[in-house]
Amino acid sequence: MSSESEKGQERLIQAAKLFSCHIQDLVSFINRFIELFNLTMKTQILPMSLNEESCIKDFLEQMIENFKEMQLMADVKQKEMQKEPLCSKVVTEVTSAGGKCADLSPHHMAEEMLKTIQTSGAALVPKTSHILGSLETSLSLLMQFPIMGLRLSDFHSEETKEQPDATTSEKSRSPECPKTTKEEALKRLQDMLCPENAHKPLETAAEELEQFIKTMDMTLQVLRKSIKTMEGNSCVLTQVQGK
């Protein structure tokens, strides 16, 4: 192998490792988002898992379906809150809780109303609904890439025994799944990413994967910002409910 080919091979290997890390980050971030959604909406949506032999596209399709279900839950919650005028609901709850509404100063009345709005979830549901729409769009964009038809194990030659989320049945099948060699992994990636008769197939495949990783970065940024927003909302909600 020429030095130029070796350089392209190493570049593709590094891109594949980075892609694998990004997929693991995606799973972790999505599960954190689900955890926060359950806390905010009082739902019990189960976390997602992705083992080495799972098709990445299948995982994303399931996640998009989950987001649609979560979107429906958020819409139902928002409609429920709209049935009763928020101002009337807030005043009723403040009056019944305090019993001394007439004795409250305007500042304290406003403070109590804000607490009630936060506790009722009125301030959280619209944000959550918007976040879900953004995430669904981001994942749908990723689905358009042919590379998503590969398995996580196609991007490296590590054994699946290190997977913490693997079930007993999955672990028992692991010995039957032949370990992917570096050469096989690279060839599979090259065939998926590189057009036929490319002048520098390894470098071309590496460039394609690097561009895809940039697209994934944007999806991860959406998730990071969404999680940060929901963590802030959940923190406020917990503090208010604890008073």
Curated annotation (Swiss-Prot):
Residues 157-181 are annotated as: Disordered. InterPro entries: DUF4533. PANTHER family: CHROMOSOME 12 OPEN READING FRAME 60 (PTHR36289:SF1). This is Uncharacterized protein C12orf60 homolog. It comes from Rattus norvegicus (Rat). The lineage of its organism: Eukaryota, Metazoa, Chordata, Craniata, Vertebrata.
